[in-house]
Regions:
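Acidic/histidine-rich catalytic cores of soluble enzymes
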Residues: 156-244
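Acidic-and-aromatic substrate-binding clefts and catalytic sites of carbohydrate-active enzymes
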Residues: 47-52, 71-81, 100-107, 131-134, ...
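Active-site acidic/histidine proton-transfer and metal-coordination neighborhood
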Residues: 16, 68, 76, 93, ...
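N-terminal secretory signal peptides and thylakoid transit peptides that target proteins
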Residues: 1-19, 25
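Catalytic domains of carbohydrate-active enzymes, especially glycoside hydrolases
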Residues: 57-74, 119
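Short, acidic/polar
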Residues: 49-60, 105-114, 206-210
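Conserved, mostly hydrophobic/aromatic
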Residues: 41, 61, 87, 115, ...
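C-terminal segment of N-terminal export signals and the immediately downstream linker at the start
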Residues: 26-52, 60
Length: 293
């Protein structure tokens, strides 16, 4: 998700249906089903705007038709009480919260306060920065223990704990594993995954295959678009549907396992509200997700 703290990986290609979907205009990939995932927005996308004009910025998001939002650590001038009231007044459901850091120690109390204020039962550790948590197999095993203990703590509080990826979670380690696949196999099944499809593609992987492999363990997907090239180029992001991402294939791969498609921009050099508006319209027009409008 983040380029820096708070200003802030190809497997075999998916064949057939995904490619066919891209060849046909306005193809509703859920045409034979009443089900569609909901469209949400990761608030980090509008971090600069909400710091200076919170209420009107959130109204713009709601007016596009977004069902809900995923929070991050909000600017200091926006209290939990203020944020919660604005979200409620605008009918924006807080379906997920990104933790400021791995929610252990004192960070747990902050996470519980967020959950109470937002009436939200899904907490995601965004995984930033890369650091050494997956560097060696011993580190990985220790990290698994920490994640499992964290998930158990929050489960007792009625909160689901999940993990978010950047590119390194889908790059092979020196000891021969892909971190997120290792975690999927070794973590308690209560831990869910939020797959950032763009960073998976940027890592050189097929995000549709990843989404299929993770199945019900990945109910939330981050949806963003761009060149998906490692380095600074990765941050030259564009509205959903205007880059290299194959979202129909991703939607087919996840099917009804996907609960939320979460639009996100790490960076955008044009008007961010135009970007999130175009992204919303693309998902609606192509029948990939459901919105209010």
């Amino acid at each position: 998700m983040k380029k820096n703290a708070y200003s802030r990986k190809d497997f075999l290609k998916l064949m057939g249906l995904g490619a066919a979907a891209m060849a046909l205009p306005n193809l509703d990939v859920f045409a034979n089903s009443k089900y569609k995932p909901k469209i949400g927005l990761q608030l980090y996308s509008v971090r600069r705007q909400i710091e200076h004009d919170f209420e009107s910025s959130m109204k713009k998001v709601a007016d596009f038709g977004y069902f809900g939002i995923e929070t991050y650590t909000l600017p200091a001038n926006i209290t939990l009480e203020r944020a919660s009231k604005v979200f409620n007044d605008l009918g924006l459901k807080v379906f997920s919260m990104h933790a400021a850091d791995l929610p252990i120690g004192d960070f747990r109390e902050a996470a519980l306060k967020m959950a109470d204020a937002y009436k939200c039962d899904h907490l995601v550790y965004p995984g930033w920065p890369q650091n050494d948590k997956y560097k060696t197999l011993d580190n990985m095993k220790h990290t698994v223990d920490i994640y499992d203990e964290t998930a158990e703590f929050f489960k007792k509080k009625g909160i689901h704990f999940g993990l978010h990826n950047h590119w390194w979670e889908f790059q092979k380690t020196t000891y021969g594993v892909f971190p997120f696949y290792y975690l999927k196999e070794h973590l308690n099944k209560d831990v869910f995954f939020e797959i950032d499809t763009y960073w998976a593609k940027t890592a050189g992987q097929n995000p549709a295959k990843i989404v299929k492999d993770f199945g019900k363990r990945a109910p939330f997907l981050h949806i963003k678009d761009g060149p998906a090239i490692m380095g600074d180029e990765a941050y030259k992001q564009v509205p959903v549907g205007e880059g290299v991402m194959d979202f129909p294939a991703i939607a087919h791969a996840g099917g009804s396992n996907i609960k939320w498609m979460i639009v996100e921009f790490d960076e955008y050099d044009k008007n961010i509200f135009d970007g999130i508006g175009k992204s919303y319209k693309y998902l609606i027009k192509n029948g990939l997700a459901e919105g209010k409008v």
